[in-house]
């Protein structure tokens, strides 16, 4: 830090505050401080608080989060317990800021009991576990559905293609894996140990959470959290207002005591002067966050750290560590600042003076009352007179007084039910003290022994007194009754933490792994940022791109340790092969495990989504019935999935089923599976073909193949299908394709039929091979292999017992991509043993070659090697590409001789609707209108690419999708588009050609 070259004290002394140098210094300092504040506001995240907050509430939230966020208190609407709601939003953002926010799957964050709609609307990379534990939870879910629908309708383009990521299962039952988690006021129903067990089930390492906190809960039966305007009270059960009067000792050591209590002790949180629903939670769960420190469970040890306690909210974090933990003494304290000015006084609780209870009274009030009571005590007076004196003083010290016309509270008002007993207890305490002092005085002067004792020197008196007290302990004076109790301002807990299970945790290796993984992920993020920056600079209008609708994760050399170990442990054979010294066998086994886990997660997600919809509509796991709010619920879900529907027991559907769609399974109280016409069940888009669970089971039952995998990586139209046709041998080969359309095309090319027995025997999809009986072959010919997961390809080879796989595909076209954004995909890319390239196309016309080269230059990162930079065409067609702008779908020239391609399902649906309006045959809009993804591998003479919207669509920026769209034709290609789309790769290249 730089220092000034002059002395400030001398400067002020010589020139005063009017001096030129002093003024300049003050101006400079003020300018620097103002600049720092402006920079903070620019950097800080803007957080809008809509709740109306008072002056004190505003100061509370600004003191807590004003330094971290740029808070905007808009004062828009009154809300129940507004400060608590505002703090909850800031707490959520604060806890999320503790973890990486890259958006990558490996940085997914779990939220136990949080609001899924908050994360959905803000675009957080979060999966919420939001169980329906009662009517309150269902009400919250219904309200979130309404809020989601309202916001989506106002800005549908922002949420196009996105779906909320949450489940309605308890946290311990959800199977989504993630390293990080948050719990914003979600631990009340789980307790410290319940949170640890949920973390273990999810493979979570670090959890950060918040909860309402008052240390006085360890002592009192009721209290107030003043900042939150919240009153808490212990009740015997959720349905009884009987107070828990357990003594303090029992409360601090209630592990054994709680086992013999008939009812659980609950804590009710009520917000003062607000007629809203309160919260009732188990005291044992709340207490665990105050008393517990560590918990060992299934090879992991979890420890809690209490980070910040502010405004009645405690922020804590739970960290899990694997392996052995040597014994260590863990010590922590809970402080009771609210009772530091109080003293405990025992008062009668029964007329026979057998039962007593302890009440709190201000130390100053008791001290002054007792002082006057001692000075005014006279054993000659009747006890009633002295009792009145004490009551008068006690009343004066705890009532409202008027001084110079101003009313003031003197002391603290005493409960009317305890007022008389407090005065009576002080009277008994005063009388007992006088009697004790009198006895002591009489004993001192009663005999010659006392006089002899008094004549001794002080050392002899001390020695003699110690000997007598040691030999005759019963001679010690002792009090028959103790009235005053000193209230401790803190409680200390000592716990010995140790765990002997598991192996020693290799922290050094873990650090190296995390560093390597972070570098790889950081490079991916840096490349994405650079690409977005380049797009932004290239466009006249600034536009920030969302993540692509479908993306292929970059494989890493090392699997995710947390997720992999959990899956590998379920299958010994593949687990053993992942540790094989033969590298390719280990890679294939790991890929098969990943593919099986991926298909299983797809199935679980489908079940979870359907169960969530079923529960939202009022269904449960016991009865086959739904409630009356069906239209509201299904209208909301229909905005994100047009295939959502209800089949009633009468046989009718709530919405018309799209033509050609047949649902193979449905969901009701009996779960997901085939349903009859007389059943009530619900469906969504995943119920048309639902074979993920079967694919996962079959894959796990196989072993990694040891045969050779060869890949022919050729450009579009290089003759891959022709090559398959020329080398196919029926006696030894089987042809496998990625999808049904490709299988039909290959069957027509080889057998001139798409449904003959011979064609269906030798040409099958990968799913068909895994799910059905099939003969063993020695060689597999795979078409469009890039659309397969590497684990699925290995499973097909293993199922067919093939010793060789010859795979054809284009690595730069659309590759396999995960349909579940929450799954950490790392082994999807094909790893061949042999690779050969083909850079000559026989399909694409001459003018397509420079267009694709230009697209590769613009879209691919610098330094990327692409075979399309040197590809050549043998086509005789020299000019084929044209484009034209259209105003709407009605101007699209629908011709049965052309093949129509769209980037999105929405544009495809619009074209199909237009074809139906024009009464075109069903075969036309079933076979001649496809999306780019569905068109991969297709070859047509005349192709038209249609874009009907000018709203943001990242698919037009991706090289792989644009490449497929531009290389399907042999003779002509026409691009028809509505409006100008920023970043449209095809339009830019066609315009420059």
From Swiss-Prot:
Keyword Membrane: yes
GO molecular function, one term: mRNA methyltransferase activity
Keywords (A to Z) from UniProt: ATP-binding, Helicase, Host endoplasmic reticulum, Host membrane, Hydrolase, Membrane, Methyltransferase, Nucleotide-binding, Transferase
Renumbered residue ranges of the record's region Methyltransferase: 51-409
Location(s) in or outside the cell: Host endoplasmic reticulum membrane
Chain ranges of the Alphavirus-like MT domain: 72-290
One GO CC annotation: membrane
Xref: InterPro entries: (+)RNA_virus_helicase_core_dom (IPR027351), 1a_necrotic_phenotyp-det_dom (IPR021002), Alphavirus-like_MT_dom (IPR002588), CMV_1a_C (IPR022184), P-loop_NTPase (IPR027417)
(+)RNA virus helicase ATP-binding domain sequence ranges: 687-838
Polar residues composition-biased segments: 542-556
Region (ATP-dependent helicase), start-end ranges: 712-975
(+)RNA virus helicase C-terminal domain sequence ranges: 839-993
A GO biological-process term: methylation
Residues reported to bind ATP: 714-721
Pfam families on file: CMV_1a, CMV_1a_C, Viral_helicase1, Vmethyltransf
Keyword Nucleotide-binding: yes
UniProt similarity note: Belongs to the bromoviridae replication protein 1a family.
Subunit record text: Interacts with RNA-directed RNA polymerase 2a.
The protein's name: Replication protein 1a
